[in-house]
């Protein structure tokens, strides 16, 4: 007879909203798609008009939340970054222009696509705890991401490949208690060496 078998250990329910619970592999996957615009901040951004730095951007991706506060995402983005250069390069087009202070410059456009992987941190859940399933709490959430990617310039005679760094702060407004659909506002920085 096993005397230690007489007392069984059973899991106890807890209301601790800060406990870490991982999920099964197929749970908590998501897809993302966003369109927006960005401003290219290069070395010569001040020689021309600000409107000449604005460009559209498209991103699609897939990700997974491992815990309510920590996840990863794989993302593909494509855009062109418009800016200015004080010398002709692979990225410049058109004729020479002159700034108000007499500085000569050229308009530039860098076409690129980027594949990146990022770690995501749901700041709302990390600081306030998990709100529970189908809850009307935390309908507004803030998510920070940091990652690394591979960026490819295209449409120039010499193709360029380089590493990229990614920083992002996202505000999500969920539209249902299930939190399966949201409208997001993102501030994102993609950092890369332009080599011109």
Describe the predicted segments one by one.
Residues 47-53, 154-164, 196:
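Solvent-exposed loop/turn segments connecting transmembrane beta-strands
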Residues 29-31, 56-60, 113-117, 163-169:
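Hydrophobic, lipid-facing positions within transmembrane beta-strands of outer-membrane proteins
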Residues 164-196:
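Extended serine/threonine-enriched, polar tracts that run as long, contiguous segments within proteins
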Residues 31-43, 78-79, 141-154, 187-193:
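Transmembrane beta-strand segments that form the barrel wall of outer-membrane beta-barrel proteins
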Residues 68-165, 175-179:
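Gram-negative (and chloroplast) outer-membrane scaffold detector with strong preference
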Residues 22, 54, 61-63, 120-124, ...:
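Transmembrane beta-barrel domains of outer membrane proteins
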Residues 30, 71, 143, 170, ...:
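Membrane-spanning beta-strand positions in outer-membrane beta-barrel proteins
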Residues 1-63:
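Short glycine/proline- and aromatic-enriched beta-strand/turn motifs that initiate or cap beta-hairpins
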């Amino acid at each position: 007879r096993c005397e230690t078998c007489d007392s069984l250990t059973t899991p106890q329910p807890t209301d601790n909203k800060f406990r870490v619970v991982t999920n099964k592999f197929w749970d908590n996957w998501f897809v993302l798609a966003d369109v927006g615009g960005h401003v290219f901040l290069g070395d010569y951004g001040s020689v021309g008009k600000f409107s000449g730095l604005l460009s559209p951007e498209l991103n699609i991706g897939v990700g997974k939340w491992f815990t309510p506060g920590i996840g990863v995402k794989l993302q593909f983005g494509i855009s062109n970054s418009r800016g200015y250069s004080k010398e002709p390069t692979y990225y410049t087009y058109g004729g020479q222009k002159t700034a108000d202070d007499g500085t000569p410059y050229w308009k530039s456009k860098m076409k690129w696509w980027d594949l990146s992987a990022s770690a995501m941190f749901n700041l709302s859940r990390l600081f306030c705890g998990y709100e529970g399933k189908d809850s009307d709490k935390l309908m507004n959430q803030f998510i920070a991401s940091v990652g690394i990617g591979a960026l490819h310039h295209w449409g120039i005679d010499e193709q360029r490949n380089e590493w990229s760094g990614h920083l992002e702060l996202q505000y999500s407004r969920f539209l249902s208690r299930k939190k399966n659909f949201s409208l997001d506002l993102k501030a994102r920085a993609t950092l890369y060496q332009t080599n011109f």
